[in-house]
Amino acid sequence: MKCYFVRHGKTQWNLEGRFQGANGDSPLLKESIHDLEKLGDYLQDISFDAVFSSDLKRAKDTCQIIMSRNQHPQTITFEPALREWHLGKLEGNKIATISAIYPHQMQAFRHNLAKFNNSIFEAESVYQTTKRVSSFVKFLKDKPYQNVLLVGHGANFTASIRTLLGYEPAVLRAKGGLDNGSVTSLETEDFEH
């Protein structure tokens, strides 16, 4: 099975440098829509056996734009398990402001999730958010799918993809994150390797 993970397009809050999380949401930027159409063109010949998207509007809109360009129509299933990391009190706040107040926590959030203290912000733990996504992906194991499209979010997908690859929490985001509108593919036969 080949899984195509797509991060939603760039939003107003991405532009403003705000945390969105699982409860904050903002619309896609107009210029992002054009980029997503190009991504849809790039993926247009892939026949997806299943298409799943986070149920948050920015991801739903991204998925619908991509699939509107696909040569093989497929029903989109909106899946709460693919929601962004619940970031609690961080949601809606400017990243620069939080970084000034909690420099060590933001350094940990960006580069060493093992040191991120989610309870300060009433947020999901790294384990909770990655377990949610990796469990959903592993649920697909017994399905007769060859190609699966999953549309979701940057912080969650970055950590979850690397969890699926066997990385420890300390290095899940050590090399940065996923760009808006990017696609990352993982292929597996047994969901163990």
What are these regions (language model features)?
Residues 8, 81, 153:
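Active-site glycine-centered loops adjacent to acidic/histidine catalytic or metal-binding residues
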Residues 1-4:
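Extreme N-terminal starter segment of soluble prokaryotic enzymes
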Residues 13, 69-132:
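Phosphate-handling substructures
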Residues 154-158:
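GST superfamily/GST-like fold recognition
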Residues 48-55, 77, 147-151:
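Short glycine-rich phosphate-binding loop at a beta-alpha junction
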Residues 7-71:
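Active-site-proximal alpha-helix that buttresses catalytic centers in soluble enzyme cores
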Residues 167-193:
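Domain-level recognition of soluble alpha/beta enzyme cores
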Residues 45-47, 140-146:
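Glycine-rich phosphate-binding loop signature in dinucleotide/nucleotide-binding domains
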